[in-house]
Amino acid sequence: MAKGQSLQDPFLNALRRERIPVSIYLVNGIKLQGQIESFDQFVILLKNTVNQMVYKHAISTVVPARPVSHHSGDRPASDRPAEKSEE
């Protein structure tokens, strides 16, 4: 798994699992809204009145309608508190 996926996948999976409504802003400024039905390495399937397959390279920002619960196991090591070193 690529390093960039270590934060992206747990975040998108939490949005999908908890059925949190999202606003997805594309690089051209268009705003899409719905719930994440599914995703893979390249696309997100967004469900609203219709299903839309959105290519990740076209996405600028994903904004959840409410806070997403984070589990410590989902956080990459770079986001965990640093261990104190003995000096």
Swiss-Prot record:
RNA chaperone that binds small regulatory RNA (sRNAs) and mRNAs to facilitate mRNA translational regulation in response to envelope stress, environmental stress and changes in metabolite concentrations. Also binds with high specificity to tRNAs. Essential for virulence in the suckling mouse model of cholera pathogenesis. Residues 71-87 have a biased composition (Basic and acidic residues). Belongs to the Hfq family. It comes from the Bacteria. Pfam families: Hfq. One of its GO terms (biological process) is regulation of RNA stability. Gene3D superfamilies: 2.30.30.100. This is RNA-binding protein Hfq. Residues 9-68 form the Sm domain. PANTHER family: RNA-BINDING PROTEIN HFQ. One of its GO terms (cellular component) is cytosol. Keywords: RNA-binding, Stress response, Virulence. The keyword Isomerase does not apply. Residues 65-87 are annotated as: Disordered. PROSITE patterns: SM (PS52002). One of its GO terms (molecular function) is RNA binding. Disruption phenotype: A hfq deletion mutant cannot colonize the murine small intestine despite retaining the ability to produce the colonization factor TCP. Deletion of hfq does not impair production of the sigma factor RpoS. Expression and activity of the sigma factor sigma-E are dramatically increased in the hfq mutant.
